[in-house]
């Protein structure tokens, strides 16, 4: 699979240098991407996910530092314009919905094969993570993005991982 178009921007960390991704001529090697990486992962698998992650960062004008970040509301634009996602991809804020409505939105997205990118913030910082499943008890499965640390099922009203990596609330 290939993406669409290209994008160039100048992150401040490069002091005037630029990063460019040519999504339309890049073949994303999904078959080589693994659910978990370790010291035994092949170079091809590491390169496949590294290229995707670099392009994801470029697509949202990632601000790189020891705690990198980007604005969440640009993610739908990037998914549609560069990665050929359905135009219906949307940015929604939790505060605009009741608990029941929010749960239904998450379950509907997952049922339709669309994991949900979510974010959380505290005075200590912010972090993006992914809802990629749910169970019969109304718990959502969270991939926190910390190499598997603390992944598991949580209530959306109690997203408190026991151990936290970069961007956690502790």
Segments predicted by a language model, with ranges:
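Intrinsic disorder/low-complexity segments enriched in polar/charged and small flexible residues
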Residues: 9, 32, 104, 146-148
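Cys-His-centered catalytic/binding microenvironment captured across papain-like cysteine peptidases
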Residues: 111, 124-125, 135-170
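Cysteine-nucleophile protease catalytic domains, especially the papain-like/related folds used
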Residues: 1-93
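Active-site-adjacent substructure of cysteine-protease-like catalytic cores
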Residues: 81-143
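Weak global preference for isoleucine
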Residues: 13, 58, 75, 105-106, ...
